[in-house]
Amino acid sequence: MAKTGAVLPARRNRVLLALTLALTVLAGASSSEAAPPSPPGPSKPAPATPPAASGASALQGIPGMDFSALSPSAQHELATVLSDEFCYCGCPHTLGQCLTGHTGCQHARRMTRLAARQAAAGVPATDIIVALSEYYASFRAPRQKLEVDPRMCMGDAKAPVTLVEFSDFECPYCGKARPVLEAFAKKNATKVRFCNVPYPLPMHPNALPAGQAALWARDQGKYWEMHDALFENAHRLSTATLVELANKIGLKGAELQKALQAGTYAQELEKYKSMGTRANIRGTPSLFFNGRFNDVQLGLTEEMLSHALEDETTWRANNNAWAAD
């Protein structure tokens, strides 16, 4: 360890001399002319015009349509859609051109309202364009043949549109969709026949016996009562709960337990699962309007369902084509 001691006289003199020379150099430097300041760097470019402004201006002047309620970012995304996407009626114009130059085209207005709802929900323009393209392409795609027991349907059997939902009783998204779909079906009972098909997913172990319980209740005349009870108890669908729910809706839980143990409805449920697989179901809930897959990425709201119903009705009324404006 180094120890602290007195500095020797000769060494002290050398230190003082070095300090004196250093101070002399510094004094000379301070007396010399200061170097000219560096030229200022290039000025920063002015901030780019916010996308919102260009979006808002692009949406102005469209006859009969007002998008001022949309946020600036949503207006920008919608403006991009209008400039990049073509009208689904088949005319050689973008949506924006069709709205301003072909004002009689009702298709462009409907398509724009659909895009505006997506933009308002925060969906970027690229995703909106993909969703719109897939939605309108679905009308020309081959329809799926879906055979559902009429006891699993509600509404007029002669309704022009049949809406089939494939759902999993443990699926949280299906649970959220249930009240929306049922309200829509009841509101449009003469226009829509709504059918539900159990489609248990592999990751939901209790969805399989729950689906069998629904089919069993159907044979007792209470499919929809069991359907609703299952969704309301989706977090606890053990066999004991299924028996409890059967008793609660006025059926004999002991009989349901026997049916589950015997696998009475396993084969029929497998048939519905196979039907969904053939229809290329990618998840639940999956909706089909007259056999046409209606992707829920556009939203599963009563407004969107009404939009799809109107489109399906228009398509059918024009012999499976879009009317030319």
Q: What would you call each of these model-derived segments?
A:
Residues 28-44:
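Signal peptide processing junction and immediate N-terminal pro/mature segment
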Residues 3-17:
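Bacterial N-terminal signal peptides that target proteins for export
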Residues 72-88:
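Immediate flanking context of iron-sulfur cluster ligation sites
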Residues 18-28:
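Bacterial N-terminal signal peptides
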Residues 162-167, 173-186, 197, 243-325:
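C-terminal cap of thioredoxin/glutaredoxin-like
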Residues 54-62, 137-154:
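N-terminal "domain-start" segment that seeds a small globular fold
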Residues 74, 146-161, 186:
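A short beta-strand-turn-helix
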Residues 81, 88, 94-119, 169-170, ...:
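Structural alpha/beta surface segment adjacent to cysteine/selenocysteine redox centers
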